[in-house]
Regions:
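Beta-strand-turn-beta hairpins that frame and shape the catalytic cleft
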Residues: 63-73, 88-91
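Active-site HxH/HxHxD metal-binding segment of metal-dependent hydrolases
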Residues: 4-68, 162
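Residue-level signal for the nucleotide or nucleotide-sugar donor/cofactor binding architecture
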Residues: 15, 72, 111-112
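Beta-strand-loop-alpha-helix segment that lines the small-molecule cofactor/substrate pocket
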Residues: 1-2, 95
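Metallo-beta-lactamase
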Residues: 76, 81-172
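Active-site-adjacent C-terminal substructures of enzyme catalytic domains
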Residues: 41, 74-76
Length: 175
């Protein structure tokens, strides 16, 4: 059995799915129900992915997922894209395009929602703050310079300290 989890279906993350499905016909492809192509305009930005299995959890809600000895937690983290999820377990937090090393994903593409992104960032900060600081955050892109490099990953301790969005994110009504 081969399994592929999708954080979201923007073309830069999902372009290879048809070829993967052809090459590995038994591939299980997991994604959030809301990540299905949202509109005609969205077809330019999103790639249709025929998920074999979906989650339908509410924004910010975590779902435990297991396959063999692999146990992960999927959190519905919309904002950058509908149905965006983050995945964590086994010492890794895969942020997709919710978070990068020092910044966060954009919300100006079709399906982007700044308010949902803000809520997802607040929830991500809560989750990251409860995980070991030596775990690794893997961003969906390597955009940010950190300590003279553009790293593939950053420790959760460093991302909590140096990510501008996490350092300053609040929801209206919070102190």
């Amino acid at each position: 059995m081969c399994i592929r989890d999708s954080t979201h279906t923007h073309r830069d993350h999902a372009a290879g799915y048809p070829g993967m499905m052809k090459r590995f016909p038994d591939l299980e492809v997991w994604g959030h129900e809301e990540a299905r192509v949202p509109s005609l305009l969205g077809n330019v930005v999103f790639r249709k992915v025929d998920f074999t299995h979906t989650w339908d959890n509410e924004p910010g809600e975590c779902v435990d997922w297991s396959a063999g000895s692999v146990n992960l937690v999927m959190t519905h983290s919309p904002g950058h894209a509908p149905g965006h999820v983050t995945i964590h377990g086994h010492g890794v937090y895969h942020a997709g395009d919710l978070l990068f090393v020092r910044s966060a994903g954009r919300v100006d593409l079709p399906g982007g929602d700044p308010r949902a992104q803000q809520r997802s960032l607040v929830r991500a900060k809560e989750i990251l703050s409860g995980l070991p600081v030596d775990w690794r955050l893997i961003p969906g892109h390597r955009y940010d310079n950190f300590r003279g490099e553009v790293p593939d990953w950053i420790s959760l301790g460093d991302v909590l300290q140096h990510n501008y969005f996490l350092a300053h994110i609040t929801m209206p009504g919070e102190d």
